[in-house]
């Protein structure tokens, strides 16, 4: 599973499944900050996931949609051009 990118929007992360709280809540709207369900937001806690959650994440992160891929590429190109 690729943990370098948010499983919701595809933005780069630092080893988390989500880039922001907003993306986390989009995937888990009923989660509170102290909810046990939300303990999977860090990659270090992946071993605690049930197979149900792992299957869900594999399906969502294995094949990015064409629009996500093109927006990631466009964002990368734009960031490289901005440096020039």
From Swiss-Prot:
Keywords attached to this entry: Nucleus
Cytoplasm recorded as keyword: no
Induction: Up-regulated transiently when the growth phase was changed from the log phase to the stationary phase.
Pfam families: Ecl1 (PF12855)
Compartments, record wording: Nucleus
InterPro entries: Ecl1/2/3
GO CC terms, sorted: nucleus
Role summary: Involved in chronological cell aging.
Protein family according to the UniProt entry: Belongs to the ecl1 family.
UniProt-recorded name of the protein: Extender of the chronological lifespan protein 2
